[in-house]
Structures are given as structure tokens and as C-alpha cells.
Regions:
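Membrane-interface helix/loop caps of multi-pass membrane proteins
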Residues: 2-378
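Extracellular/periplasmic envelope-modification machinery, especially enzymes
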Residues: 253, 316-320, 324-327, 334-335, ...
């Protein structure tokens, strides 16, 4: 929600406006606690900020004062930054204490972004879901996106209004009418952009451009206010209706936001701002002392309530607030906000020594320096810890490579003790203990184990666990496949060698690509890959989205026009809410691919859940071949017969990797001292690299 900033101008004090802020703050609290009503607080607070700022600016300009952009900026941010900085510092400290280590870097990034007013753009960049129901997984600083948006407008609006005033005076125009005209145009242009912009990712909620029209509408109405006078009785009647509309939106979910529907509560808010001074029932309700008191501290309430909500849910390991604890946390939030207002906000805002432009600038500079220095010191600590974890992981990969090079460790279960030359009556020599970080090799090793140290990778190195390749794919592949956004098109090896093609989503990238590259390096193949996040390779399926369906169709077209020797793909699809199934139309897809002359190598998908498997595993201590959190295989994977329809297709070879994910009916999250998953469903690069030698040997066996 946008922060309910108190008017920074000397305007006639109106208790009803403070009461209006309180109503909107209650809407924010109820929505954040229980998703009650429509998220209109963001829109209504924008209206109040723009309306009051513009009203004051026009009054000063009409009185002959020269607009001072610097004074406006320093007045605004002197008031906003100190409470914000304290909130960020305390929240970051509490987050380090309560949140999993893998989330610490995100908190540091958001702390920097919040203090420098671009948090909304950061959240849009990482595709944050504002309406996610599991608040425990939300960032404790997520709510400050709105403060960033307002901060951007508080920088832009004074400069824009000052420029309009200067030009209006030079052209002999009315300042009020010029400002009205400018903001009417901005309102129209911004609304047109909002209505015509596609938002498949849902990140438009954090986009400043999506709410410029709301700022502009508030400014336009403020400029037009003198022409909107009504008789006292009519003004009071309009205020009552407006308050009723606002309360309705506070209690009932109506429309989508941001969107044109926001115009209704915005106009209701405008009516209360315009006509509330006429008194009457609406003004009387809004001037009720408890509401006025809440309105006076609404900025601080907004700052502190969300971190309190989220960190409480993390501490008690719950996804949502109940009625009792929700109300209790609201009371706590109000109490903390009252302290923050009394000892930080009010003194800085009201003491005479803090009101010169120089002093205001010094307060802003000192506050920013203290806040950014605090966050930077934590960042340095994370860098040091991350570097230590990275070096530890690199050492583990060296021991893993040594283990993988020994055939007895790679796939000893594949050896048939009853085969020719082996006497089943003679007990085999005992195998040496498996040590170090063998990863997947431990899942198939029948001997003893002697693991020491923590499982890898560490929580601060998970960003390095995504498989990345630098090689470019061929020109024909690029021409067809790169027309689809966020498609990875990679090439590895000598293009004149026999060719392997890997297609699929990030699951294929994490599991199949390490094996394909190892096979290329050892046996002299050229590997080409077309990988698209969130888009498993299957028959083109409209349900997967136009872009994904187009990508998959382009892959098949490419293979038909540029035949390859081998194609690697994942032929099943797991689900967090059901049992594994064959990929959509995968039988027809394999038939189409083999018709090009390619041999198809298929494996099954890895585990997919609603639980952060890394965090779950990190709380356990592995001391056998597998450990961490143990999941029940039948809950996620189908029986082995799921592959039967594909086995009848000439040119298809199934490579079984299920024993690298599960042992019997138990699926661990740590194997051979290596974390298998980095989140809810992606295999770590480290584990994928330990799988690669085993998969390569099995591919060779399948092709014999």
C-alpha cells in the first residue's frame, strides 16, 4: 500500500482528513491480515498526497511566491526518511535472525532499494506476487514498494509543477488552469497506457507508470477545486455518499488493481477532500477522536505493521494470520508506531531548528549515510560468508569428481554378481567407505559411508547453482528459437561432430545439460540446446501459453529442417499437487522427432513440491547415503509403467534415473552430502554434476 504521508504544507488543519487516513489505514491492515475488501488504500493515499501537494503549490504560486523545488524536496524527505531508515534497519536485523539464510541477500537488496526509493522496480524485476496467500514467504520489506513509488512522484511532481508555473507566467496564462490542463493530459495518457498494456507476469502492480494517472487525477481535481463548490446541504450529502462508497470498497472485493475501477474510490476520496469542510455526518464520523489519533500516526503504522505481520508468521511457522493474533498484531503495530511517531517523526517534523533548508538537507544526508552504511556492513558480512561457502563448495566438487572417476563408485549396482567370471558362492571383498561429497553416486553405492562436514551448496551460494552456458547455438537454431522471449539457445563442442539436441525447461537444463556436455567432452559430440524457463518440451499446447506453445512448435520445426543424431528430453511432468504424468502429447512428440531420423533419449522429471526443499533439508543432518527431508515417492511419482507407451516407439530409449532421486519409496533431499534441490523443484547444479557420469554411462548402455 502507498504510505499515508501527512501533508507537508501549512494548510488549514482538518481532523476529518486525518480520520480519512485512519479509515484507509484500517483497510490496509485488514487487507494485509485477512485479504478483506479491495486494495484501495494504495490508490486513495495517492489521491490525498497529490491533492494536498498540488493545492498548496497552487496557493503559493497564486500568492506570487516563486516555486522552490529544492525546498519542497528537502521538506518532504526530511520527514519521510528517518522513520523509514529506522524501520528498514530494525526489519533487516530481525530478518537476519528469523529468516532462512538463503533469503538474507534478498533482504539486503531490498533494504538498499527501499532507502533509495526504487523498491517497486526491484520487486517488479523479480516478479513478486503481491497477492500471494502465504505471507510467511513474503519479504518483510515488500510493503515499501509503495513508499518508493511515492518517493519517485515526490521528486517528479514539484519539478513538473514548477516548470508549468514558470511557463504559464511567461505565456500570461492562469497558473491554476495551466496545472489543470497539464494533469488532465497526463491522466488521460497514463490511463490509456494502463488499459492497453498487457501484463502476463502480474508485475504491473509495482509499476509506477500504472499509477501516474492517480497522482495526476488528484492534482487535476485540486486545480479545479474552486469551480466545484456546492451548497452546504448538497456538499454534506455528497460526503455521506462518498464515505459510504469508500467503506463499501474497504469491505468488499471489487475490481482489479491497479485499473480503471480505482477511479470510483478515488472520486469518493476526492469528494471527501473537497466537501468535508462543510461538516455534516461524514465529517463528524471522520473527526471522531480515535480515528484522528490513528490518522496522526498512520505513516508509522504503515511502516511497521507489515514487518511485524510477516516476521510473526515466520516465527510461529504459519502461512496466514487468524482473527485473534491478527487483531493482537494490529494493536502491537499501533503501539510501536506511536513510539516511532513521538520520538522520531514528530520532533524532526516540528522542531524549529530542523526547518531551514540547510538543516533539512543535513538531516537527509545523515539519515541516508547511517542507513546505507548499516546495510552495507551487513552486505560485507554476507560477501565474506558467501565466499567461504563458495570455496567450500568448490573443494567439495573436487572430491566429487574424484569419486565419480572411480567405476565402483559410479554405478556399482549395475554390476551383475552372477555374471560370467564371478562365483556367487564367494563373498566379494568389502567396499571402502564412501567419503567426501559423492552426491548421486551415494544413491547407488552399496558400501559403507563416512561423511563429514556440512552438505553443499551453502545457502548463500544458491545463485551459483543454476546451470549456465556461454556457447551460442547455430544460426538456423537462433533464427527460429530466439524469437521467443527468455529462450536459452546454447551450443557446445565442434559443430561438425555428431549432434545432440536438448530441449525443455529449466528442469532439463539442470539435469540433462550436465550429462550432455560430459558426453560431448568424452565422446566427441556437438550439443545444442533450446531451453525455456517454465516451458517443458511437449507437443504444442495452447494451455501452456502462446509463447511456450510457439517455442515448442519452433523446436520441432528446427529438428525437421535440421536433423540431428540424438535428442534428449524429459518425458514426464511432476506436480506439486498431484502424481507425475506423461508430458502433454509426448508420445506424438517422440514419434515426430524419431521421424526426423533422430534417436530419442528420455528420462523422467524430478520432484516438484510446494515446500522449499533446500530449507527443509538444511534443518537435517545427513549421515547415510541419503537424508535431509524424506518424502514418500508414491505421493509424487507414478509407477514405472508410466513409460510403457513410449517404449513401443522405434528409436526411443528410456534411461532410468529414478534411483538417483529416490531409494525405494523414500525420496531424500540430501544425497552423498550434497543438497539435491535448490528450491521447491529444481535440482542443484552441484547434484546435477554428480548425476552426469551415471547418466552418461546409462545412455551408452542404452545405445549399445
Amino acid at each position: 500500500m502507498v504510505v499515508p504521508v501527512v501533508a507537508l504544507q501549512k494548510t488549514p488543519h482538518r481532523n476529518d482528513i486525518q480520520g480519512l487516513r485512519a479509515v484507509l489505514m484500517l483497510q490496509v491492515l485488514f487487507f494485509h491480515a485477512w485479504f478483506v475488501g479491495s486494495p484501495i488504500g494504495v490508490d486513495a493515499f495517492i489521491m490525498i498526497s497529490a491533492f494536498l501537494m498540488t493545492s498548496s503549490f497552487i496557493r503559493r504560486s497564486e500568492a506570487g511566491a516563486t516555486p522552490s523545488v529544492l525546498e519542497r524536496w528537502t521538506t518532504t524527505f526530511k520527514r519521510l526518511l528517518p522513520p523509514l531508515t529506522i524501520t528498514v534497519a530494525v526489519t533487516l536485523t530481525a530478518s537476519i535472525a528469523l529468516l532462512p539464510a538463503r533469503r538474507w541477500q534478498d533482504m539486503v537488496d531490498q533494504s538498499f532499494a527501499s532507502l533509495t526509493y526504487w523498491q517497486n522496480w526491484l520487486l517488479a524485476h523479480v516478479s513478486t506476487d503481491y497477492f500471494a496467500e502465504d505471507h510467511a514467504l513474503a519479504s518483510p520489506l515488500q510493503h515499501l514498494w509503495s513508499m518508493s513509488m511515492q518517493g519517485q512522484m515526490f521528486l517528479l511532481w514539484p519539478a513538473l509543477m514548477a516548470l508549468t508555473v514558470v511557463l504559464a507566467r511567461k505565456m500570461g496564462l492562469s497558473v491554476r488552469r495551466a496545472i489543470f490542463g497539464v494533469f488532465v493530459v497526463i491522466t488521460a495518457l497514463s490511463l490509456i497506457w494502463l488499459v492497453t498494456t498487457s501484463d502476463p507476469s502480474g508485475t504491473i502492480y509495482f509499476d509506477t507508470r500504472a499509477r501516474i494517472w492517480e497522482f495526476a487525477l488528484g492534482s487535476a481535481i485540486a486545480a479545479f477545486a474552486p469551480y466545484l463548490r456546492l451548497p452546504t446541504l448538497a456538499a454534506r450529502a455528497v460526503s455521506v455518499v462518498a464515505l459510504g462508497v469508500l467503506v463499501l470498497f474497504c469491505l468488499v472485493s471489487i475490481g482489479t488493481y491497479p485499473g480503471p475501477m480505482a477511479a470510483v474510490p478515488l472520486l469518493a476520496t476526492s469528494a471527501l477532500l473537497l466537501f468535508g469542510a462543510a461538516g455534516g455526518p461524514a465529517a463528524g464520523v471522520l473527526s471522531w477522536r480515535p480515528l484522528v489519533m490513528l490518522g496522526n500516526i498512520s505513516y508509522s503504522v504503515y511502516l511497521v505493521h507489515w514487518p511485524i505481520f510477516v516476521l510473526y508468521l515466520v516465527a510461529v511457522d504459519r502461512e496466514a494470520l487468524g482473527v485473534v493474533d491478527g487483531i493482537a498484531l494490529m494493536v502491537v503495530s499501533v503501539a510501536v508506531a506511536a513510539v516511532l511517531t513521538k520520538y522520531v517523526d514528530s520532533p524532526i517534523r516540528s522542531l524549529p531548528w530542523a526547518n531551514t533548508t540547510l538543516r533539512k538537507t543535513q538531516i537527509i544526508g545523515l539519515t541516508l549515510w547511517l542507513g546505507l552504511t548499516f546495510v552495507f556492513n551487513i552486505q560485507v558480512g554476507l560477501w565474506k560468508t558467501s565466499d567461504a561457502q563458495f570455496r567450500y563448495a568448490e573443494d567439495s566438487r573436487a572430491t566429487s569428481d574424484q569419486v565419480s572417476a572411480q567405476p565402483a563408485f559410479v554405478d556399482v549396482l549395475a554390476v551383475d554378481n552372477a555374471s560370467e567370471g564371478v562365483d556367487p558362492e564367494v563373498e566379494p571383498a568389502p567396499l571402502p567407505p564412501l567419503t567426501g561429497f559423492p552426491g548421486a553416486a551415494a544413491m547407488v553405492y552399496p558400501g559403507p559411508f563416512a561423511f563429514e562436514g556440512e552438505a553443499v551448496p551453502g545457502p548463500l551460494t544458491l545463485d551459483n547453482e543454476w546451470v549456465m552456458y556461454e556457447g551460442k547455438c547455430s544460426d538456423p537454431a537462433r533464427a527460429l528459437l530466439l524469437q521467443h522471449a527468455k529462450t536459452g539457445c546454447h551450443g557446445h563442442g565442434d559443430p561438425t561432430n555428431p549432434r545432440i539436441f536438448v530441449g525443455g525447461s529449466s528442469h532439463a537444463e539442470q539435469v540433462l545439460m550436465p550429462a550432455a556436455r560430459l558426453l560431448a567432452d568424452q565422446d566427441g559430440y556437438y550439443v545444442e540446446a533450446a531451453l525455456k524457463a517454465g516451458c517443458p518440451w511437449s507437443a504444442p499446447d495452447p494451455a501452456s501459453g502462446e509463447d511456450c506453445a510457439g517455442h515448442n512448435a519452433a523446436i520441432l520445426q528446427y529438428l525437421q529442417e535440421n536433423p540431428v543424431d540424438y535428442v534428449f528430453l524429459i518425458v514426464t511432468a511432476t506436480s506439486a499437487n498431484g502424481v507425475e504424468q506423461l508430458g502433454h502429447g509426448v508420445v506424438e512428440l517422440v514419434e515426430d522427432v524419431t521421424a526426423t531420423g533422430a534417436t530419442v533419449i528420455g528420462i523422467r522429471d524430478n520432484l516438484r513440491t510446494n515446500t522449499d526443499l533446500y530449507q527443509c533439508a538444511a534443518s537435517q543432518t545427513p549421515d547415510t547415503s541419503y537424508g535431509g527431508c524424506l518424502l514418500n515417492r508414491p505421493d509424487y511419482f507414478a509407477s514405472d509403467s508410466i513409460i510403457d507407451p513410449l517404449l513401443e516407439i522405434p528409436g526411443f530409449h528410456y534411461v532410468n534415473v529414478m534411483d538417483l532421486y529416490c531409494s525405494g519409496d523414500v525420496c531424500p533431499t540430501i544425497a552423498g552430502n550434497v543438497q539435491i534441490y535448490l528450491d521447491t523443484n529444481h535440482v542443484t547444479q552441484t547434484y546435477g554434476q554428480t548425476m552426469a557420469p551415471i547418466i552418461v554411462d546409462r545412455i551408452r548402455d542404452a545405445l549399445k
